[in-house]
Every structure is written in C-alpha cells, then in structure tokens.
Regions:
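Disordered, acidic interdomain junction associated with two-component signaling
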Residues: 1-23, 138-141
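C-terminal output helix
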Residues: 3, 121-130
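Conserved acidic carboxylate
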Residues: 26
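Charged docking surfaces used in two-component/phosphorelay signaling
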Residues: 33-40
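Active-site beta3 strand of CheY-like receiver
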Residues: 61-67
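Receiver (REC) domain active-site loop signature in two-component systems and cognate sites
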Residues: 72
Length: 141
C-alpha cells in the first residue's frame, strides 16, 4: 500500500502492522514513483513532498525508516533531518542525493544521517541498505 499526500490533503493513513513503514521525502514525482515501484509490496510507504512535510509526517506516523532527498523546497533534507533528530536519534535516515562526491557523502554522514544513497537509485543497493537497517533494528528491539 502506498500513499502520496499533497500538503493541503494530509489525511489519516492506515498503517499495516506487519510491515516496516518508510517515509519517502521526495519532491520529484518521477523519483517517488521509482522508489514506490522498487519498494511496493514489501513496505508500507508514505510520501512527503518537502522537508517540512516530512517532519510533520514523522511526528504523526512514526515511520521505522526515512528516505530523505537533500534538495527540496520549503525545507531541505539537512534541516528536516536536524528537526527530526530533536524527536528521535534512533530512526534511520538515509540521504538520497544527486551529489555524489566523497565530500558530499562526508557532509551527509556528519549531518545526522545514517546512510547515503546517490542518484540515480540502484534498486539492488537500496534494498540491501534497507535490509541491513531492518536487521539492526530487529536485533535492537
């Protein structure tokens, strides 16, 4: 089940109990659809169009994992992650970015993110990173 929510249309989302919930903060609809096609069926997906909405949806739905685009309107991924970290130091946040230099990855990791995924998205690597995060969370529970 996937839900794409426009800012003016925030509605309750039914969360499936047996699936990890992933919040995808992505302002580009094509990129979101790519994530959805890779992850649908395996995860409960919720969608934020910008960083501010991602913070609001995090507080409302408490997802287990966040995929956070870096370059978004209203509030970028760095600021959104900083805000989310005020509420939870534990939720894994993976930065999704077109910036692919080593210095970009270093900045991401120093900014409170738990992982880094350069665009274009590689489905196999994304699934592997999510599986690793989920296994760590299950061990910690």
């Amino acid at each position: 089940v996937e839900e794409s929510i426009k800012k003016e249309e925030i509605q309750p989302i039914s969360i499936e109990k047996n699936k990890f919930t992933i919040l995808i903060a992505e302002d580009n609809e094509s990129n979101y659809k790519l994530f959805a096609s890779i992850l649908k069926g395996e995860y409960q997906l919720i969608h934020a169009w910008d960083g501010q909405e991602a913070v609001e949806m995090f507080k409302q739905y408490n997802p287990q994992i966040i995929l956070m685009d870096i370059n978004m309107p209203v509030m970028d991924g760095y600021e959104a992650t900083k805000e989310i970290r005020k509420y939870s130091a534990k939720v894994p946040i993976i930065a999704i970015t077109a910036f692919a230099y080593a210095s970009d990855e270093q900045r991401v990791m120093e900014s409170g993110f738990d992982g880094y995924m350069p665009k274009p998205i590689n489905a196999r690597l994304l699934k592997a990173q999510l599986t690793e995060i989920m296994q760590k969370r299950i061990i910690l529970l």
